[in-house]
Amino acid sequence: MADITVVNDTGELYNVINQKKSEGYLESELTIISKSKLHLNDLHDSEISLISTSGTFSDRMTKLLTGEDGEHAVLSRYNLAPDELEKYKQLILDDKMLVVAVRDKSSHKEVQEHNSAYEEIDITHFAEASKGPKA
């Protein structure tokens, strides 16, 4: 279940991010949803997902032609009830930001155990095993 916090400005945004981290959320489990793109360099260099519902210029043109709703498309991935979805959609349209925290319940243990990139190989090479010239 998504834990959604409504934020009014960037100062409050940083406080909520720090609060979520203190609650045990990882940066990769946090998403910030806003109407327009956030120009916050320190967040661009983190694992926090930044999603703007307006999208790129081509996204806006596509929405104009297809009638698709960007806010609805972004919020639909969190399985919200219809009334909650409308409430959060309206908050985004009112230039509020949403901090969405979702626990990552997937396990990466199998990948780490069976991926050859994580194998520790002992490469010990002795001179007598070499077929080349001996010095």
Curated annotation (Swiss-Prot):
UniProt record similarity statement: Belongs to the UPF0355 family.
Stated name of the protein: UPF0355 protein SA0372
